[in-house]
Curated annotation (Swiss-Prot):
Active site: 2 (proton acceptor)
Family: Belongs to the 4-oxalocrotonate tautomerase family.
EC numbers for this chain: 5.3.2.-
InterPro entries, per the entry: Tauto_MSAD, Tautomerase/MIF_sf
Top-level taxon of the source organism: Bacteria
Listed name of the protein: Probable tautomerase YusQ
Isomerase listed as a keyword: yes
Amino acid sequence: MPFVQIHLRSGRSEVWLQKLSRTIHQSMIEEINVPEDDYFQVIRQYEKSEFFYDPFYLQVERTDELIYIHFTLKQSRTTEQKKALYRSIASRIHSELGVRKEDVFIMLAGNQDEDWSFGNGRAQMIE
């Protein structure tokens, strides 16, 4: 059950944002076996004065088109699955939305089953 937070500069259309969201989700389905209906994402847009990055950290040249994609998900994926996910997302966003691969910044934060409540104040994954 991944929860995805997407952060980017403001100015994109609703249609573009929906395509970005679905593009990321499709990579999750294919690379880390996320069910199609396991779809929980938020997109936050920021003004220039609220969005910061180093344009050359680790010799990757970034622009104002930078997209931060932050996953919170169970610690059940292998290193190879994670690497495949990174490649798939960057490639898809580039080919479908025209964003440079260098501007796709992905972070994964793992947790356990007991760290999720899907509503009703219950921990459904451990009940």
